[in-house]
Structure formats: structure tokens, C-alpha cells
Amino acid sequence: RNAEMQREIMINEITNVTGEVFMGMGVGCAQCHDHKFDPILQKDYFALQAFLSSVYWPDDRYHATEEEISKYEKDSRTWDETTEGIRDEMKSLLEAGARKTYEFRVKTFPPEVQVMFRKPWEEKSAYERQISFLVERQAEREVRTLATAEKILKKGSAELQRYGELKEEMAFFENLKPEDLPKAFVSTDTGREGAVVRMKEEEVSPGFLELLGGEVPEIEVREGTSGRRSALAEWLVRGDHPTTARVMVNRIWQHHFGKGIAASPNDFGMLGEEPSHPELLDWLAGEFVKGGWKMKRMHRLIMTSAAYRQTARFEPSNVHEVIDPENKWLWRFSPKRLSAEQIRDAMLAVSGELRHRDGGAAQTSAVPVRSIYVKKMR
């Protein structure tokens, strides 16, 4: 029931992942104290977190075209109008019990969280909106699980019998209900106001890491958003940013060779491994930026290189095997394991069952399309 702690864990995780994925820095070590090995200050951690603290995840956005959404909404309205009488009667039979269950669940949260939740939306701060979002999702999920007819209505009652009749009638219309559009997993801000981040009770403003310049960000507040995440994103993809491009091309290299030029892709600091070919890493990063940060271009550049097209044949008598048995200097191509998705696609291809397609909606793994089109729940 600790919605505040849940929110804290989520924001900390986002901050840590942002540092590792885009900057190659284990910033999480600076959450409780200054980093013991890298020059990352604790105040830098919370300044980075201040960019991300207002995020929340709406669940009402569709991953579909305007035409698909328009047709879906039209068909849904027709279905709603047709079944309105049945649904209203079913709802009225359960309403008192459902409302009681909902209120009971809300009351299990700490008193200060209940106060935040019951405030009018326009009076809530960004932090209070995030907490309310978490409380509402938990309470609604438990109502769906607990507030069933069998648990609310008295056994053998006329109300339970009537509900069963309505349920049978509704089953016919369920088959006619428009198929739900796929939901888009998106994040947005709670509003124009940024959520307050504190370090030892002191409010911390968004700021870039001292290690990487420590300049004061220019944040443009726009309608419905604090503008903080946009400011962070624009800083990360600046051409002169010292880490982002290097970290990204290192990940692409790792995808193709099984091991990055820097073998610790999430940590370019003192605890990570030094790049085996630092000049190559710098050059690839420069090409990545010059090419407009286009990943397809970088994939093509690496896959057409002499290093990638080398043989993987193992010859024990080769002098290179004696000098560099780990192939650190890339004198041959190191075999690497295929991913589960690559194995799946290969099996479908050799069996002749693979369906070739370009684009379209995501599918379940049971549909024989390439794995790039298969939903992956995280």
C-alpha cells in the first residue's frame, strides 16, 4: 500500500537506466552518496532525476492510424448504444458492492495518500497526480478481481439470478464487440509543473552532470508538459556530447560481434573495461553523429567492414591464436550465440512457414511472422 515508495522505486529505476543506457554511467551508485570510483556527485544524481520526476504512463493511447481509431470509436459507440440497457442493469446490481470495495481499497492506503487522492485534479501538484494515478490503478484492479456478482450478491437471491440472465444475454453481444485496438506504451508529464525532487530535504533543480560540463539547462515549458525530459533528450543528442554517441555505437557493435569495443556497455567509468580500440570507437561515434544518428546507416557500415566479414574458422596452429586467444584484436570473427528470436525466425524460414510482411500491427508469437513484429511484454 506504500504508493509513495512505489513511485520512488519507479523514478529511481528510470534515472538509473537513463544513466546506463545513454551515458554509459552507473549513476545509481550516487543515489545514497557521492560515487566511490567515478566523479559523479550525489547532487548530480538528483539533478538528473529532476528531469524525469514528472513522468507517468497513460493507458488510453492507441497504436493505430487516425482512420482506424475513428472506425473503432464509431463501432464502439454503436455497440455501447445497443448494449447500454443490459450493461446499466448489470452495473446497478453490482454498483453498491463495487463502490464499497473501491472505497475499502482506497482506505487501506496511508492517510496522507488518501488526502492527495481525494483532492480535485486541478488542485493536485505533479507529485500528487503521480501518487493518485498509482492508487487508482491498484484500487480499480482489485475491484475487477474482488467485486464479482458471486461475491457481492446473496447466494440464491433474485438479484443473482437476474444477473445470470443478463450475463447470458450479454454473451451474445460480446462476440459482436469491436476488437480492441493495440494500446501504445507511452509516457508523458503530469502537467506543466515539474514534480519536486529533494536531497536531504533540499529541493533540487534539473541539471546536467558536473562531470559532463554541469551547465544549467534551458527548459521550455509547453502546454501540458514541464519540458524537462525534452531538455534532457536534446542535451543527450547534441553533437558534442561526450558519451551518448560512443555508448550507442558500442551497443550496435556488441549486437554484431557479441562483445562491445568497450566490453562493459553500461559502464564506461572506472569499474568498466577500457575500450580495446578507442580510436575506432571515437571514429564510429563521429560517423554516427555525422550521419544524423541513423542506426541503419551504422549497421550497414559495420556489416560491410572487413572486420565483420572475416572468417570464424578456428585454426590452433595460427600464430594469432597464441598471441591473442581471446580475439581481443579481432584477427578473426568470433562465433556468437543466436538470440531466441533469430532461432525462431530461422526455424520458420527453413520450414517454409515464415510469412513475409512489411509493417502492420504487432502479433502474438503464435503467428509465423518475423520476431520483430511479435509483441514483447516487459
What are these regions (language model features)?
Residues 1-81:
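Sequence context surrounding c-type heme c attachment/ligation sites in exported
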Residues 1-5, 54-82, 105-159:
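Short His/Asp/Glu-rich catalytic/ion-coordination signatures at enzyme active sites or charged loops
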Residues 15, 45, 113, 344, ...:
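Extracellular structured ligand-interaction cores
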Residues 4, 29-32, 112-116, 229-236:
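Short amphipathic alpha-helical segments and their helix-coil junctions
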Residues 82-105:
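Long, charged alpha-helical "stalk" segments
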Residues 8-11, 39, 78-90, 125-378:
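Primarily short, surface-exposed interaction patches in extracytoplasmic proteins
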